[in-house]
A protein has these predicted regions:
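Non-heme Fe(II)/2-oxoglutarate
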Residues: 2-113
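Catalytic core of non-heme Fe(II) oxygenases with the double-stranded beta-helix
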Residues: 94-211
């Protein structure tokens, strides 16, 4: 059995990404990995992180003309199992990247972190959408070291963020931020959106090589 040409990493009898031993990591990544450990406390929820004004600005960019749809997960045969719709290229008018980065550095007491992108993207999750168990930095992209999600609405059913190895299920409120390590200790899934539409601001941060 292989995952994207690698041996898979198995959690709860599911392939959740490449096996960690198959991926070469930089010393800076290893330093961060060892520093934070595998505590449940590394899953951080910050209530009311964004203001109504900031959320309204982001949601004003939910425009079908700028929507890009993509396959977010495939089965072992390469068939699409989940689609996400993104609204891309949003100008960071309110310095949201910096706000999130400052919070991450504070939460993990670690400074060598940078955002992967320079513009913001909103993900739309329609009813019926879900994301099966996976690990962010063991997937097709292996540099998604720290994911951050800001919830832009809460008027939907389902769509919980679940960390089964930590016995944790989260359905945040509008404006809340969630950050967590993207490594092997934090496999997670998004439960099916039962009704309504779920909107999130999804941002990834990386641990760059130290010069």
């Amino acid at each position: 059995m292989v995952y994207n040409n690698y041996m898979p990493y198995i959690v709860n009898n599911q392939s959740v990404g490449h096996h960690p031993n198959e991926i070469k990591r930089a010393p800076s990544y290893i330093e961060f990995f060892e520093k934070i450990g595998n505590s449940k406390e590394n899953i951080v929820v910050v209530s009311n992180f964004l203001s109504d004004k900031e959320i309204d600005y982001l949601m004003s960019h939910v425009d079908e003309k700028r929507m890009v749809s993509f396959v977010s997960q495939k089965d072992n045969e390469g068939n699409p199992t989940s689609w996400i719709h993104n609204y891309e290229g949003i100008i960071d008018k309110y310095n949201i990247f910096k706000k999130i980065l400052d919070q991450i550095k504070k939460s993990y007491n670690y400074q060598n972190i940078k955002p992967k992108y320079t513009s913001l993207n909103i993900a739309r999750w329609d009813a019926g959408t879900k994301l099966s168990l996976h690990v962010d930095d063991l997937g097709y992209l292996t540099e998604n070291h720290i994911p951050a999600l800001v919830y832009l609405n809460d008027d939907y059913e389902g769509g919980h963020l679940s960390f089964p190895t930590h016995n944790l299920n989260i359905k945040p409120k509008r404006g809340d931020l969630i950050i967590f390590p993207g490594n092997m200790h934090y496999p997670h899934e998004v439960k099916e959106v039962v009704s309504g539409t779920r909107y999130t601001l999804s941002v990834w941060f990386t641990i760059p090589d130290m010069l």
